[in-house]
Regions:
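Short amphipathic alpha-helical segment within the helicase RecA-like ATPase core
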Residues: 1-178
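A short, hydrophobic C-terminal helix/tail in secreted or cell-surface proteins
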Residues: 179-183
């Protein structure tokens, strides 16, 4: 899986867009889906509570895009961000969305590089598959996970650390699969 930082949505059609929002920060998002988010907010279906995921579809120039609102709650910690991001990226994978963009603009500057690293790790680990002994390999899911942020240079080192950490985790898990006795 390719991880990248982007400063704008650009011409690329995204199959899925993840919009993480803190509880009570639903007004902070400014982007192409402001009207849809306002309607969801008015309906009371999404409050931004930790682990809450709300999905809707939006018609864009590139076709139908799946929009995921991800609730981060009031207090963001590393493990919660890792777990909650992993949940939403697994949903993207199950829907076989090839290109997913996570829009962090509503969270900056509170979203620290350490929190960003956990979000990027979650995306990278979602792509892990151990298919060595399967007759039919698991179909590929997310090929590109991008993170949209205004201060991309702030997160460059964290992105590199996330890639290394995720790769090391995948190697360790693969090694475990190869060395454990089968019953």
């Amino acid at each position: 899986m390719e991880l990248q930082l982007v400063r704008e949505y650009g011409a690329r059609p995204w199959d899925g867009v993840v919009v993480p929002l803190g509880e009570g920060d639903l007004e902070g998002y400014q982007g192409p889906w402001e009207k849809e988010l306002a309607a969801v907010r008015a309906s009371g279906r999404f409050a931004g509570k930790a682990g809450e995921i709300y999905r809707f579809s939006a018609l864009t120039e590139g076709g139908l895009t799946q929009i995921f609102l991800l609730g981060l709650g009031k207090n963001w910690d590393l493990e919660r961000v890792l777990d909650d991001c992993a949940k939403v990226y697994r949903q993207c994978q199950e829907l076989r969305l090839g290109a997913v963009c996570t829009d962090l603009r509503g969270l900056e500057p509170q979203f620290t590089p350490a929190l960003f690293q956990k979000a990027a790790e979650a995306a990278a680990l979602t792509g892990y598959r151990f298919d060595k002994y399967k007759t039919v390999p698991t179909p590929a899911g997310i090929r590109t996970a991008a993170f949209l942020c205004e201060e991309s240079e702030r997160y460059e080192a964290a992105l590199a650390e996330a890639e290394v950490s995720a790769r090391a985790t995948c190697i360790a898990v693969s090694y475990t699969h190869l060395t454990l006795p089968t019953n």
